[in-house]
Amino acid sequence: TRSGGSVDIPDVLVDATVPAPAAPTGHDILVEVKALSVNPVDVKVRAALNHAGGEERILGWDAAGTVIAVGEQTTLFQPGDDVYYAGALERPGSYGQLQLVDERIVGPKPRSLDYASAAALPLTSLTAWEALFDKLHLGRDSAGTILVLGAAGGVGSMVIQLTKALTDVSVIATASREESRDWVQSLGADAVVDHFAEDLAQQVLAIAPDGVDYVFTPQSRGRVPLLTTVVRPFGEIVAIDDERDLDLYALKDKAISWHWEFMFARPRHG
């Protein structure tokens, strides 16, 4: 991608030929990309480019493909292995035929999935997994209720499925359109409430009168009053957005915990 202008300008998104990545060293593997996925992070990275300077960047942080070369320290994969991964923000992305990626943030592609299906999973699934099990510390014996806002989205859909498959926590999902409501119910949501309803808090509390134990939210802006109302004392919230001006003081009276989930923190900071 090249920064600058609206998408109707021909050179904003460029089909370009660039030098092939260098031979992999260390823990890097070189992957022939067979399929990729598009995510909000692509838009965010592109928006941060130097528009005036015409900065260029290979986007893409979800891929599936085949290993064609490995570094001297690799132990997990060898040429010919099919893999899938999200990659790291600091490196060129998957919108190319070849990509270098650290094997330690790569997984074997499930044999039951084709490349396109596998490429749709890493970023959303890892985000949902870390939100539930690293941030909220849910486990097999966990109970209570989680409110999943934006439940029909990519991450929300995975949050529902992982919660129902791996815990005893009940799921209240928000959705608006009939298709979205049917979708989240098909994934296992125990109850569905109207995402845009003015009485959303009342709908949630009608299902969980004492408040929900946990909340997953993909968007924080304007949500703190709702969350203050529907989360029980000592409850927990995990958010995945980039809201910079967020006043959380209203949560203090109930000692509600707020967690940030950022999937790229692990490859960036170890």
Where are these regions (language model features)?
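Residue-level recognition of short, solvent-exposed, well-ordered loop/turn junctions
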Residues: P24, Q78, G139-D141, R232
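Short, glycine/polar-rich helix-capping loops at beta-to-alpha or helix-loop-helix junctions
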Residues: S94-Y95, A175-W183, D245-L248
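A structural motif shared across PLP-dependent enzymes of the aminotransferase-like
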Residues: E90-E103
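Glycine-rich beta-strand-centered segment in the early N-terminal region that forms part
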Residues: P19-S37, A47-E90
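Short amphipathic alpha-helix with an adjacent loop that forms part of the alpha/beta core around
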Residues: D199-D210
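N-terminal Rossmann-like NAD(P) cofactor-binding module of classical short-chain dehydrogenase/reductase
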Residues: Y84, D213-F216
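Glycine-rich phosphate-binding loop and adjacent beta-alpha segment
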Residues: G222-G270
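Mid-domain Rossmann-like dinucleotide-binding core that forms the NAD(H)/NADP(H) cofactor-binding site
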Residues: A119-A197
